[in-house]
Amino acid sequence: MKAGKMIRQITRGEWEVLSAEIDPTGKYLYITSTEASPLEVNLYRVTLSNGKRERLTPANGVHTPLMSKSGRYMIDRYSNHNTPRMIDFSDLKTGKTKNLLCAPDPYDGYAMPDIKCGTIKAADGETDLYYRLTQPAKIETGKKYPVIVYVYGGPHVQQVRDGWKWDARGWDIYMANRGYIIFTIDGRGSANRGSAFENVTHRQLGKIELQDQMEGIKWLKSLPYVDENRIGVHGWSFGGFMTTNMMLNNPETFKTGVAGGPVIDWKYYEIMYGERYMGSPKENAQGYKNSNLNRIAGNLQGHLLLIHGDQDPVVVWQHSLSFLKSCIQSGTYPDYFVYPGHFHNVLGPDRVHLYEKITRYFDDY
């Protein structure tokens, strides 16, 4: 920019720039972006005089590079679905690279499920959405398997990337080895797909996200080995909001849900986040009303467990307590569990208990 006017656009394309830094000489701009794939993060060197880009991270995957002040040396930390962790040191002037760390496979010697990544269309019929499917290694002919949808769905989070095992969590792997299918999809409103993709949920949180999650459910039901009568959903924070949202708006679909630290009414949420995406309750009264899950507490049919830390300063206790009151008034019966002394998440030794609790709930129902 010069005197408030743009001189020229340096980058252009259907991808997102995640970070940018000019080198000391003023000749180059170093950026990380999703140009190669929405699932990857790579480092590029852009010549400011002509806009020419050079990719500096040759391996596929999610890279977290560190540059020297001179711009000559780089430490490249990365992983991809086949590589648990790699650290390389590169001299960008000579092109020489030395490996500093090649982490061993932490799952070596253990039975592993089948983990795959793919795309389906969003509810708009046009946008590609990326999913991760973690399922038992051997699918028996004629057998039907229960499904757990692990959901977040909100802004600034991307759950499916070309990281180690497609970013599958240890609990996903554990549950798949016990006979569950774990499904995760990044719908519209999630991160690293550009502003239009993320901003489509503005002032109407929970609407578009729900539509795209249900497209994922349609696809799951098309698989011959999925038991459509045993579909559950689990998420935390915005994912807890989405879990409750999905259970209440599609009670015939979801048998069981576990919502951790769930947002219930966005007017109770911190202004910094809530008003960024919803506007104020005064100027967007209808949007807040539509996204308030208390108004449809009477729709609950399946088994829903809400979990909350009693010291949560982010999603304050008022969220889940107000929902319990709404359920009492409407005659529905969720389950509830509190972790004393914990904040927005359950950490430390009690986290083992948390995942045992979640696992038992899905096993029981």
Region annotations inferred by a language model:
Residues E35-L39, N80-T83:
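Short glycine/acidic-enriched loop and turn motifs that connect beta-strands
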Residues V62-Y365:
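Serine-hydrolase catalytic core recognition
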Residues K27-S33, R72-R77:
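Short beta-strand elements that form the blades of beta-propeller/WD-repeat-like
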Residues K5, L39-L43, G51, R85, ...:
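Repetitive beta-architecture junctions, highlighting loop-to-beta-strand starts
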Residues M1-S19, D23-T25, S33-A36, V46-H63, ...:
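Multi-bladed beta-propeller domains
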